Structures are given as C-alpha cells and as structure tokens.
Amino acid sequence: MFDEIRPTRVEVNLDSIVHNFREIKRVVGDRVKVMGVVKANAYGHGAYHVAKALVENGVDYLAVATVEEALELRSYGITAPVLILGYTPLSQAGEAVEKDVTFTAFDLKYVKELGEIASRKGKKAKIHVKIDTGMGRIGYTDFDLAEREIEEMSKLEGIELEGIFSHFATSDEKDKDYAREQFERFADMLKRLEKRGVNITLKHIANSGAITDLNYAYLDMVRPGITLYGSYPSNDVNKILDLRPAMNFKTKIVYIKEVPENTSISYGRTFITKRPSKIATLPIGYADGLNRLLSNNHEVLVRGKYVPIVGRVCMDQTMIDVTEVEGVEVGDEVVIFGEQEGKRITADDIAKKLRTIPHEVYCGISRRVPRIYIYRGEVFDVKNYLKI
C-alpha cells in the first residue's frame, strides 16, 4: 500500500489518540477541561491532523511551544483556543494577536507592550500567567511581585487575563513530596490573587503524571501530552488509563545478501558474522529517527519474528540479520516499533534502551519520513513533508 511514498513511513492512528483523550476525560470528569498538548508537531505525530481530531472530539484547548506552531494551526483552519506555552517575542506578537492566539506571560512590562500592540489592532491579547513553583524555567518565582503585577495586568486595556498555570517537575516519580510542595505553592499564589479580587477563569498545573497520580491538582483544566499519544510519562505512575499507542514506525527490506562467516557489517566493523548469514538492508537510518545508539542494540519485527540490528546504524541505511526468518523477501515489511502478527515493540521499549523517554523517540522521527493517517477506521490522508 502507498508504493508512491518512501518504504520508510509512520502510520498514525488518530482513532487511538481520540480513545486516549476520552480515557483522560473519563478519569478527570466532565467538570475539568482538557488542553491537548500538540507542540513539536504533536510529538512527531502531526500537529494539524492530531489537533483537528481532538477538536472534533471535544478538546477544550490546544497547547504549542512557539508562535510559529500556533500560527501553523491557524493556517490550517484550526480555530480552537491555542496557548503558546513558551515565550513569544513581541516582534512576533502582532499576527498572533490577530489570529486570537493565547500568550504565556510572566512580566508586567511585556504584558503592557503586548496590550498596546493588541489595542492598536482593536483587539485584546489573551494571556495565561506562568508561575514557576519549582520547575526552574520561565515564570514568576517572587510571589509578592507576582501578585502585584498580575493584579495590574488584570486591569490593562488590550489584555484579557484568562489563565494562570504552573508545571510539575516530578509528578511522574514515585516520591510525590516535591510535587505536593509545588502544588501548595501554586495554591498559595491563587489565594493571594483571590484576596486581591483578581478572578482568573482557567487555573491549570496538571500534566500527564498529575492526571494519573494527583487528582487534587486537576483544578479547572489538565494538560495531557504524552498520554494522548499512548505512552505513560514513566513507569512509576498509576496505570489507570487504557492507553493505545498511536504510532507505528515501519520500513521495508530493499536488499538481501548471503554472506559467509567472518563478514563485517557497517562502519567500524562492530559486527562480524559468526556463521553464514542472511543480511537485509533497510532504507532507514539515524537521519530518519532510528537512533544510532540502537546499533547492535535493538530488534525489529520481520514476518512476526524479532530480528537484530547488526552493525552500526548509518545515516540513511541499516542492516538486520534475517537468517532465521523463513521465506524472507525483498519488500517485506519491517516494524521498528508498532505491531506485526500479534507481536509488539513500543517506543517505550526503545526509550529504555536509549536511557531516555518515549517523548524523545516520537519527536526524533524526522520530516523526511511520510506520515499515513488513519481516522475512523480508514486511511484518509498521507503527509509527505518533502513533496513539493
């Protein structure tokens, strides 16, 4: 299927993402809104397609990392509220104001200038104020300053103070003491603002780890990221969601050769055959997202059998040992992660080998890998980023 695109491709099952979203809604309840995090091209899954599916199924808000990501969604006709989680330079704010994008704010001078930009356009800039309760990134750490400046922000022309938020550093770890401290700091900030008569509609701090483990932190809205895509943030959280991985990473065998014992494979001769072997070449490498650290350190699926990567992963090609695979042929499907004949390899499995997190595995799949989208049980689109 889809012979007109590269043998190396990703299949994204949007039905799985919708299922995961509904699982999150089931856990947090109808009172709590959901902000679907689609930054970094929806963790490599495709921001537009994921956002569209989430909006069609009732997500309340979307979140991205940069102004460019927000404007990309607007260019595709996504009209749902979109929060830029990171800093937006004022030099880039004008179009975002026009397109009703929501800004993260943590400085009064910045917000005043943003309000002036919005007023000149006859608009109000919507902001969510960021409080750093212990992550160590952007956001107010001086709470006395924060409450004074936020009160002033709430009175500015050209500004709509819609939200306030923070981010957990350790919600996915076994020890929840630090996460609890962070929440208490955030709750203290909210009380201070209430005393000043500052009413803020959306208060949010719960990421994926907090959704599973810290139900007291749900507040008005939760911000699932990795759980939308079918992975837990760590092995230490409660597995209360029926998650379905949404991505399959696949390629095909393009060449098979039989080699004798003592044949070296790939750069550096890190693998030398110990027997007469069948070695298959795959048109996939670290430039596609198959990490070089998986050299001699990962198995893929061919005809329902686990077979090893042999030798170093190259930039564009990789070799596997298919000696034990009966009837193997050029053109056979190879699963890097995903399912085949009832067997599964997950992004989480790969992340463990790389001593990282599944987020990085998903995000590492490059733009030269086409995405095939499945929605409502059917293939409905193919995205080839390199097609002109």
From Swiss-Prot:
Q: Name one GO molecular function term.
A: alanine racemase activity
- Record flagged with keyword Isomerase: yes
> Gene Ontology terms, cellular component aspect?
cytosol
Q: Which CDD domains match?
A: PLPDE_III_AR
Q: Which residues carry this modification: N6-(pyridoxal phosphate)lysine?
A: K39
Q: Which UniProt keywords apply?
A: Isomerase, Pyridoxal phosphate
Its Enzyme Commission number? 5.1.1.1
Q: Does the keyword Transport apply?
A: no
**PROSITE patterns per the UniProt record, alphabetical:** ALANINE_RACEMASE (PS00395)
Q: For this chain's UniProt record, which GO biological process terms are given?
A: D-alanine biosynthetic process; peptidoglycan biosynthetic process
Q: Where are the transmembrane segments?
A: none
Cofactor(s), names only, from the UniProt record: pyridoxal 5'-phosphate
**According to its UniProt record, which reaction does this protein catalyse?**
L-alanine = D-alanine
User: What role does it play?
Assistant: Catalyzes the interconversion of L-alanine and D-alanine. May also act on other amino acids.
Q: What family classification does the UniProt entry report for this protein?
A: Belongs to the alanine racemase family.
HAMAP family with a match to the protein in the record: Ala_racemase
Q: What is this protein called?
A: Alanine racemase 2
- Organism equals Caldanaerobacter subterraneus subsp. tengcongensis (strain DSM 15242 / JCM 11007 / NBRC 100824 / MB4) (Thermoanaerobacter tengcongensis)
> What gene does the UniProt entry assign to this protein?
alr2
